[in-house]
Amino acid sequence: MTAILIPSMYAMSGVCAFAALHHGIAVMQRRVGKLHLLFALLSATILAILLTKAGAYQALTIPELVALRRWEVAAICLLFLLFPWWVAGFTGVRPRAFLLGSSTLWVLLFAINLGLPYGVQYVDLPSLTYFDLPWGERVVDLRVLQRSIWHNIGLLGILTAMAYSVHACRVQFRRGQHRRARALGWALGLFFGSILFNIAVNRGLIEFVHLSDLGFFALLLLMDLEMMRESRDQNRRMRDVLDRLPPAICLKNLHGHFQLANLGFAHLANADIHGILGKTDFDI
């Protein structure tokens, strides 16, 4: 048996952990804005989804399967709770009523999933069946062939988030932010394509395992590259501005008095500034 799926999911979870730490530390150091904080949280939820899904594929008992899938759905609820807000921050398209309504829906589904005996995924206690992949790997069959009403409501919420994200990307492109919109468009295409593939799998149209995990990872990877590129460009532009500023040790306030502006440059230039601080041109 050649194990490909499970090791790949653990490898992707490592990348997600790195992205969450990278963006989280950058936010704590105040090198980037709140959009990166949302992205760090998204990365953490994708990490949780990958780990719980990988565990569910290897579940040995039915209670273990139900518990892992319950926590997987909880992480998915958190992902789609945060995702529209991140899209709003990235594109500048902020329909407040939709964002608040979407958040309310996912908080409700999060609570219901934890309260139901078998979670949102299962109507009754599932059986432990297996799926043989083309390359010989055997995993637990996670297809949801009998769906609860809450599962369908969650699916409707996902489709609504998809529609909003595509609309926001389109508006962003029309506003002239072509590079940003193209990067987001590619990420959304892979992300939503994998979700639609999941829907086809759950309805028995395709005999395969879910691919949404790859879509989550593709979204994270592409947008991480784009956001890091923007941060580097912003830092480079700031350095260019600072490099063109004349070095200054003291500046004048509104009343014409000299005030210390750059102690480090004063030490570098070996300048004696104590005789002019607080004075005007007429006092020197």
Regions found by a protein language model. Name each.
Residues 2, 22-33:
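Short, hydrophobic transmembrane alpha-helix segments
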